[in-house]
């Protein structure tokens, strides 16, 4: 059975992007397959246990900003936020970075350990049924998608209905969220 852990370990974080407050991380396998991890909750990028960038920083101007903060609109400032600055200065030149380990918290949190002392933490911050993060294979006819929303995680496939997996089950196994559909 394939799971998110099996799919991510050994891949390399190759690129990142964001659309408003949706953070997109792309992981490339040795055969060129690209897996995407999209976060709509708290995401932290660390280097040797120091914070490089946080998804909360998309709402703050970069350090070079010298205008009126009351007129600054984060939604119109792609590339000019404190998050963008942290990613550019703290992560860009280190890419690609190999994924060494993947673990999960009790509430659907994800912890990725990368080479060179980097790590990624995705922390679910809501009790609602809103989607917190999504993992999928890019440009693939048989979609592999893992979604964390509320108290359950789902494996979504083109030909299969949603299949729930409870969060306590995830925490006990610490191996992934669902299976390939």
Question: What positions do the PLM features span?
Answer:
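Surface-exposed, interaction-prone regions used to assemble/regulate multi-protein complexes
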Residues: 1-181
């Amino acid at each position: 059975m394939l799971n998110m852990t099996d799919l991510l370990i050994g891949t390399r974080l190759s690129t990142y992007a964001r659309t408003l407050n949706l953070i997109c991380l792309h992981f490339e396998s040795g055969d060129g397959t690209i897996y995407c991890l999209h976060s709509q909750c708290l995401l932290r990028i660390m280097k040797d246990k120091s914070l490089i960038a946080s998804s909360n920083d998309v709402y703050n101007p970069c350090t070079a900003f010298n205008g009126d903060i009351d007129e600054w609109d984060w939604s119109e400032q792609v590339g000019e936020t404190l998050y963008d600055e942290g990613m550019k200065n703290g992560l860009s030149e280190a890419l690609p970075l190999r994924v060494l380990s993947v673990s999960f918290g009790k509430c659907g949190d994800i912890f990725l350990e990368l080479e060179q002392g980097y790590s990624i933490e995705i922390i679910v911050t809501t009790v609602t049924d809103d989607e917190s993060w999504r993992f999928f294979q890019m440009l693939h006819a048989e979609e592999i998608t893992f979604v964390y929303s509320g108290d359950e995680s789902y494996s979504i496939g083109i030909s299969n209905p949603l299949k729930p997996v409870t969060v306590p089950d995830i925490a006990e196994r610490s191996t992934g969220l669902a299976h390939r559909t």
